[in-house]
Amino acid sequence: MFHNLNEYITAEHALMYLSKADSIPHRTEGEAALLEFIPKDAKRILDLGTGDGRLLALVKIERQDAEGIALDFSPTMIKAAGERFSKDPKVQVIDHNLNDPLPNLGQFDVVVSSFAIHHCSDERKRQLYSEIFSVLSPGGVFCNLEHVASPTDELHSRFLRSLGLSEGEEDPSNNLLDVETQLRWLRDLGFRHVDCYWKWLELALIGGSKSK
């Protein structure tokens, strides 16, 4: 069931997430897998739900000259990302809620997201994927490191235990969806080379590219 709620608008919830982000099991493995799919010559990069800018900063390590656009709607996250990129004139942090249509920002060689899109309703997820396809340049790449639904309740409980959480401690703004449905959507929208490139329990890297 979709909870029409996103706790990250509150500073308390956003700060709690940031304090725990580095301890998410296997997160760095997923990020490393994502980086392998990002072209070294990418010129424009869009980061959806940037949080404190961690993923975009990783992408830019080997792409210093790339222009980065980072979207988020949490004042706490926007402030953190702004501070992270304060000395990088090629990065712009924009206040934007992913529940709303993407703003007109031009075309991008790469669109990335990390643990953000799963907060949207399923209908909005699919619509957002369509918008992502539209803003990708020919040959562009989309990579989404995401929190996805487990295929069974037992596996979901195992994932929660790995985080040291009980079912009552789950993020009420989560709206998890299985990998297979999202991959099907991407294929239907016209993405090529669609796959789940990496996965550990409920953490998955999904994506594809646009024809040249």
Regions found by a protein language model. Name each.
Residues L189-K212:
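Core SAM-dependent methyltransferase catalytic element
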Residues S113-I117, L145:
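Residues lining the SAM
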Residues R126-P138:
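A short glycine-rich, Lys/Arg-flanked "PGG" loop and its adjoining helix->strand segment in the class I
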Residues L46, D52-D100:
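Class I SAM-dependent methyltransferase SAM/SAH-binding core
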Residues A42-K43:
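Nucleotide donor/acceptor-binding cores
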Residues M1-P39, R54:
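Conserved class I S-adenosyl-L-methionine
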Residues P103-V111:
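A short acidic, Gly/Pro-enriched loop at the edge of an enzyme's catalytic core
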Residues L145-L189, V194-C196:
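C-terminal alpha-helical "lid/dimerization" subdomain adjacent to the S-adenosyl-L-methionine
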